[in-house]
Design a protein with these regions (language model features):
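Acidic (Asp/Glu)-rich catalytic clusters
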Residues: 2-5, 38, 65-74, 100-107, ...
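Conserved, mostly hydrophobic/aromatic
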Residues: 9, 37, 41, 49, ...
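N-terminal beta1-alpha1-beta2 module of alpha/beta enzyme domains
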Residues: 1-72
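Active-site mouth loops of central-metabolism enzymes
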Residues: 13-28, 82-89, 162-172, 280-289
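An alpha-helical appendage that flanks or caps ligand/catalytic pockets
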Residues: 123, 129-157, 198-305
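A conserved active-site cap/scaffold subdomain adjacent to cofactor or substrate pockets
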Residues: 178-197, 202-203
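Hydrophobic faces of well-ordered beta-strands that scaffold small-molecule active sites
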Residues: 9-13, 45-47, 77-79, 107-111, ...
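Flexible, glycine-rich active-site loops centered on histidine and acidic residues
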Residues: 5-23, 85-148, 188
């Protein structure tokens, strides 16, 4: 049985844009956060692809990863993830092959099958391409081929990319990706940071369908976890109101720019909205280090996850850095 100290811990950054802030500052904050969590002992620093969202500045994922990798030295950097229906597999192979060539042994390629946007934005991204989520298994296989060794009959190659064998992860919030990751023998990251409802079933499906591969001899599970750590439970509860406001805005179709914390959410949400936000953040770790340690120990005991990746979208950058620092102390015991 795994203990908390056996589990790797990583960072997922959505590169949040705050109220009256700028994307430029958000991108600089992302690098600063990566540099800090590298010192704190985190395994990876991933960024997520989202489009047409005014509160998230990580749309050009591979470009941002080059910036992050260039400003750090040891931490792995990667996509959490690239939404493959938006892209031709060859282009992704070339982009991540370039990153791997520049920063060998430090690049991860996490793949999702959702567009990471609304239908109108998805059409704007793809233009005349006919790609869709239905093509995902075939696109993953094509990407694996482009990043693997060149075969004698291969007429189209990724350069850079061929032979780099960039580690590929499958990401998802449904059972489809869990089964596919298992059948392909790939590591699996479940999006429990926003869809915890199917977490246990997805882990079961992945492990039951797992077939050893050239990259993995046994299943490897990563779970997404929302984080708000502070010195006291009261301070964490206060800081978390920025997160609640952001999720509430998402559900209402409103601006996603980060808003400052408030003393109370009363009057900001209706009872059914409070319940919906609570479901969305069902796995959230909010509190002091002592409180978070107890909750994480239960999570690891129940899931036997190999790695946890934490997302922390607080209004003040310094509060985010401190939250990750406190978590590192918890994870290291």
């Amino acid at each position: 049985m795994k203990q908390l100290s056996d589990v790797k811990f990583s960072t997922l950054d959505l590169v949040p844009v705050r109220e009256n802030g700028s994307p430029a500052q958000s991108l600089r904050n992302s690098l600063d956060l990566a540099q800090h969590v590298e010192k704190f002992g985190y395994t990876r620093f991933w960024v997520a692809e989202h489009h047409n969202m005014d509160g998230i500045a990580s749309s050009a994922t591979s470009v941002l990863l080059g910036y992050l990798a260039g400003g750090t030295s040891t931490i792995r950097v990667g996509s959490g993830g690239v939404m493959l229906p938006n892209h031709a597999p060859l282009v992704i192979a070339e982009q991540f092959g370039t990153l791997e060539s520049l920063y060998p042994g430090r690049i991860d390629l996490g793949l999702g099958r959702a567009p990471g946007s609304d239908q109108m934005t998805a059409r704007a991204l793809r233009r005349e391409r006919s790609g869709s989520a239905d093509d995902f298994p075939e696109d993953v296989a094509e990407l694996v081929r482009f990043l693997g060794p060149r075969t004698p009959d291969q007429r189209v190659i990724a350069m850079p990319g061929t032979g780099t064998n960039v580690p590929i992860w499958l990401l998802g919030s449904s059972l489809f990706s869990a089964q596919l990751a298992g059948e392909r023998g790939l590591p699996y990251a479940f999006a429990s940071h926003f869809a915890p409802r199917f977490m246990h079933e997805a882990i079961r499906v992945y492990r039951n369908h797992f077939k050893p591969s050239a990259v993995l001899d046994k299943p490897y599970v990563m779970l997404g976890v929302p984080l708000v750590a502070a010195d006291t439970d009261e301070q964490a509860d206060y800081l978390a109101t920025s997160v609640y406001q952001r999720i509430l805005a998402l559900m209402r179709g409103q601006s996603l720019v980060q808003r400052p914390p408030v003393k109370t959410m009363d009057g900001l949400w209706l009872p059914h909205e409070r319940e919906a936000v609570g479901d969305f953040l069902g796995l959230a770790m909010v509190g002091s280090p002592q409180k978070i340690r107890a909750k994480l120990e239960v999570l690891v005991e129940q899931t036997q996850a190999d790695e946890l990746i934490f997302t922390c979208d607080l209004y003040e950058h310094a509060d985010r850095v401190h939250s990750y620092e406190l978590l590192a102390q918890v994870m290291k015991g």
